[in-house]
UniProtKB/Swiss-Prot annotation:
Keywords: Cytoplasm, Methyltransferase, S-adenosyl-L-methionine, Transferase, tRNA processing. It catalyses: adenosine(37) in tRNA1(Val) + S-adenosyl-L-methionine = N(6)-methyladenosine(37) in tRNA1(Val) + S-adenosyl-L-homocysteine + H(+). This is tRNA1(Val) (adenine(37)-N6)-methyltransferase. Its EC number is 2.1.1.223. Specifically methylates the adenine in position 37 of tRNA(1)(Val) (anticodon cmo5UAC). It is found in: Cytoplasm. It comes from the Bacteria. One of its GO terms (molecular function) is tRNA (adenine-N6)-methyltransferase activity. InterPro entries: DNA_methylase_N6_adenine_CS, SAM-dependent_MTases_sf, Small_mtfrase_dom, tRNA_Adenine-N(6)_MTase, tRNA_adenine-N6_MeTrfase. The keyword Zinc-finger does not apply. GO terms for biological process: methylation; tRNA processing. Belongs to the methyltransferase superfamily. tRNA (adenine-N(6)-)-methyltransferase family. PROSITE patterns: N6_MTASE. It comes from Pasteurella multocida (strain Pm70).
């Protein structure tokens, strides 16, 4: 990945984000690289923002897979559309300007994989614009709401994957009746406490697959865990 003024260049695509309230960040990259795309012909990205995760999943999935990306904010929707059209997977990624809950309620076909990097900053955080407020605040919808929406359009053997702050992820695990089948604790720097949780849920009971991922080692260099996960995307790896 290479940073430019208005976006980031990855090995196979570029993401512009100057129109978006929420820019390209590590959370989205982690989810896009970590979510299990196996046996996923229909993939849904809820709250796609720049389209980053949708394009990462397009790169990782088979040529037969279709990715549907939903974004409510008009500026972000237009940005995601432009990023998709400039990518190698424009024929497989479809972007919709729609409320995520409404999209899930009205979906005719089920999805094999649903991903979400939902907003998680609490009310009271002073944001620069109403657009950024919309992207960041959880006052309107809880994370369990996102999970419930997704479950409405999930195939019987499908999976829902999310990235959340550690405490928010722990709270979600207590609130949902879905089965957590994969849990990855993300540690920003070796020796520190986990800061993020990558979680995968299913309608079917399966053995939990726990893991840890370290981003930086003690010398502030990228850890082999992170390099191994993101090497197909970052230009430096």
């Amino acid at each position: 990945m290479s940073a430019k003024q208005n976006g980031f260049t990855f090995k196979q695509f570029h993401i512009d984000h100057h129109r978006c309230a929420m820019k390209v960040g590590t959370d989205g990259i982690l989810l896009g690289a970590w979510a299990d795309v196996s046996q996923s012909e229909r993939i849904l990205d809820l709250g796609t923002g720049t389209g980053l995760i949708a394009l990462m999943l397009a790169q990782r999935s088979t040529k037969e897979s279709e990715i549907h990306a939903v974004e409510l904010d008009q500026a972000a929707y237009l940005q995601a559309q432009a990023n998709v059209h400039a990518s190698p997977w424009a024929q497989r990624v479809h972007v919709y300007q729609q409320d995520a809950a409404e999209f899930c309620r009205n979906a005719v076909n089920k999805f094999d994989l649903i991903v979400a990097n939902p907003p998680y900053f609490p009310q009271g955080v002073d944001c620069a614009t109403p657009q950024r407020d919309l992207a960041r605040y959880t006052a309107t919808h809880r994370h369990v709401d996102w999970l419930n929406w997704a479950s409405h359009c999930l195939s019987e053997q499908g999976k829902i994957s999310m990235v959340l702050p550690f405490e928010a992820g722990e709270t979600l695990l207590k609130q949902t009746a879905l089965y957590c089948i994969a849990r990855c604790e993300v540690i920003t720097k070796k020796g520190k406490a986990p800061q993020r949780l990558l979680l995968t849920f299913s309608l079917q009971a399966q053995p939990l697959q726990p893991s840890q991922l370290i981003i930086y080692d003690e010398s502030n260099r990228y850890h082999p865990d992170f390099i191994g996960l993101t090497k197909d995307f970052y230009l430096a790896f």
